[in-house]
Amino acid sequence: MVRYAATPANPAKSASARGSYLRVSFKNTRETAQAINGWKLEKAQKYLDQVLDHQRAIPFRRYNSSIGRTGQGKEFGVTKARWPAKSVNFVKDLLRNAQANAEAKGLDSSKLVISHIQVNHAPKQRRRTYRAHGRINAYQSTPSHIELTLTEEDEIVEKPVEQKQIRLNSRQRGRLASQKRLTAA
């Protein structure tokens, strides 16, 4: 079994999935993963579908030099955002895989939350292109390793409001007793 970067607090209520040596852009995939980290599974899947339809965008916070601006980034407080379709499809496939793993464990898929998602660099793949005057230029692709963990969140029960008991000193108790006698008479 392969070791994950983060171990879940309760492995019985968690399900994981990972993809290694995936031929998809590291930078785009990292931004896609950060956009949905901590979200509920159903919300994340719906959001990624909307990104593919260009209804919403992935905010680019770190790897955002020389990319265009769009108004769809306003909901995240950024001006630079994109629609990286290939990265979104890879992340969606891993989410679907992790959801199937969770259902096999008997977890409720409506309560699943993306508790951990991480994208790492895979070894670069080297290629070459032939240029004019007999020159050769090398170029590389930057594949990724992706891992994610879904955790079934516990229901949050609100603490009941306790009535605060007022502590009175003897002088305050005497004054309160005399006021009660006056109002009773």
From Swiss-Prot:
Q: Which GO terms describe its molecular function?
A: structural constituent of ribosome
What UniProt keywords are attached to this protein's entry? Cytoplasm, Ribonucleoprotein, Ribosomal protein
Origin: domain of life: Eukaryota
Quote the function comment for this protein. Answer: Component of the ribosome, a large ribonucleoprotein complex responsible for the synthesis of proteins in the cell. The small ribosomal subunit (SSU) binds messenger RNAs (mRNAs) and translates the encoded message by selecting cognate aminoacyl-transfer RNA (tRNA) molecules. The large subunit (LSU) contains the ribosomal catalytic site termed the peptidyl transferase center (PTC), which catalyzes the formation of peptide bonds, thereby polymerizing the amino acids delivered by tRNAs into a polypeptide chain.
Q: Which family does it belong to?
A: Belongs to the universal ribosomal protein uL22 family.
The protein's assembly and partners: Component of the large ribosomal subunit. Mature ribosomes consist of a small (40S) and a large (60S) subunit. The 40S subunit contains about 32 different proteins and 1 molecule of RNA (18S). The 60S subunit contains 45 different proteins and 3 molecules of RNA (25S, 5.8S and 5S).
Q: What name does the UniProt record give this protein?
A: Large ribosomal subunit protein uL22
Organism, as annotated = Candida albicans (strain SC5314 / ATCC MYA-2876) (Yeast)
Q: Which gene encodes it?
A: RPL17B
